[in-house]
């Protein structure tokens, strides 16, 4: 099988839970609006803009690439993340992403009352809290009184593992099941069908995969050259077995071109 044929076969297996398809679908703010209306239980919610693969920079520490950053009609800034593997401390990841997004969107000298409201929506294939629920809201609670207090940061966790008959669960079926489409979610279903079943959509996904593969190969070569030139041999060795660390160094040292 040729390399192009292999890429086409891999492209057919993609679903919205996969980073590549999600980020492509998130180019359409109507898609983000539809899923956020369901997840945040707000049928009137509006998305003013969506930015897939938003680069959250941290000059003095770890930078991140957010799957999709959205600006909502009420002023909130939202990071939507999709995750298939339960392979790290994702609660800390949510906390960190929220902090990076907040600092990137806050100008110097801004008063604390004007720090933007930020919401991180974490969509996963697995039930992160093992509570047998498809949707979790994590609130800040005063331990002594049980009162919920708000500091402008929201954490919302959604998973595709629990099938509880809720609207969120139905949406997650479309996210993970190859043949699942639902008329309740016309934008999501239509976009998924276009990229999975039409020749034009499949061609677009293949082109994106080929481009990403080539760009990643070139960036890794650049990273290796930088590490060798700066004699960071321990870092170079670590990148051969720690893909998260390699990705971190790529973001910091070889940023993707806009």
Protein language model regions, located:
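Accessory alpha/beta interaction modules
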Residues: 1-154, 164-166, 245, 255
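C-terminal segments that line or cap access tunnels to active or ligand-binding sites in enzymes
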Residues: 153-155, 160, 175
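Short, charged alpha-helical interaction segments and adjacent helix-coil junctions
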Residues: 2-12, 16, 20, 71-73, ...
């Amino acid at each position: 099988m040729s390399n192009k044929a292999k890429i086409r076969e891999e492209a057919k297996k993609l679903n919205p839970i996969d980073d590549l398809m999600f980020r492509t679908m998130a180019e359409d703010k109507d898609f983000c609006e539809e899923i956020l209306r369901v997840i945040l239980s707000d049928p009137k919610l509006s998305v003013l803009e969506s930015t897939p693969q938003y680069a959250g920079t941290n000059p003095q520490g770890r930078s991140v690439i957010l799957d999709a950053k959205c600006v909502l009609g009420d002023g909130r800034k939202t990071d939507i993340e999709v995750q298939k593997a339960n392979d790290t401390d994702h609660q800390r990841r949510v906390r960190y992403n929220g902090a990076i997004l907040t600092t990137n969107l806050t100008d110097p000298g801004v008063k604390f009352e004007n720090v933007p409201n930020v919401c991180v929506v974490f969509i996963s294939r697995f039930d992160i809290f093992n509570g047998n629920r498809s949707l979790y809201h994590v609130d800040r609670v005063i331990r002594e009184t049980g009162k919920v207090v708000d500091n402008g940061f929201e954490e919302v966790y959604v998973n595709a593992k629990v099938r509880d008959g809720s609207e969120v669960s139905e949406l997650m079926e479309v996210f993970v099941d190859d043949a699942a489409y639902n008329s309740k979610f016309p934008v999501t279903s239509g976009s998924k069908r276009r990229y999975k079943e039409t020749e034009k959509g499949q061609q677009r996904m293949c082109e994106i995969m080929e481009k990403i593969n080539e760009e990643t190969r070139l960036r890794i070569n650049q990273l290796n050259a930088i590490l060798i030139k700066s004699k960071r041999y321990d870092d170079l060795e670590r990148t051969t077995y720690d893909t998260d660390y390699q990705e971190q160094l790529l973001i910091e040292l070889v940023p993707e071109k806009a």
